[in-house]
C-alpha cells in the first residue's frame, strides 16, 4: 500500500513539474515579447524627444550668450 502511495506522489510531482516547465516557457516568451516592445517604445520616445527639442526653441540661453555675473 505504501508503494502505491509513493507512486501516486511521484506521479503528482512529475505532473506538477511538467506544468511548471510549460508555465516557465510561456512566461519566457511573454517576457521576451515585452522586452522587444519596450525597446521599440524607447526608440519612439527618443525620436519624439529629439523632434520636440528641434521644433521648440529653448528659453534658456546658451552659456556663451549669458552675461557673466556682476563680480567678474
From Swiss-Prot:
Segment forming the signal sequence: none
Similarity section: Belongs to the SlyX family.
Protein name: Protein SlyX
Gene3D superfamilies on file: 1.20.5.300
Pfam families linked to this entry: SlyX
Superkingdom: Bacteria
Listed HAMAP family: SlyX
Disordered: region residues: 53-72
Gene of this entry: slyX
Lineage: Bacteria, Pseudomonadati, Pseudomonadota, Gammaproteobacteria, Enterobacterales
Biased composition (Polar residues): 55-65
Disulfide bonds: none
Amino acid at each position: 500500500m505504501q508503494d502505491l502511495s509513493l507512486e501516486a506522489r511521484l506521479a503528482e510531482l512529475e505532473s506538477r513539474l511538467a506544468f511548471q516547465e510549460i508555465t516557465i516557457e510561456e512566461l519566457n516568451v511573454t517576457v521576451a515579447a515585452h522586452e522587444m516592445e519596450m525597446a521599440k517604445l524607447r526608440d519612439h520616445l527618443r525620436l519624439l524627444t529629439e523632434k520636440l527639442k528641434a521644433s521648440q526653441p529653448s528659453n534658456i540661453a546658451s552659456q556663451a550668450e549669458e552675461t557673466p555675473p556682476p563680480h567678474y
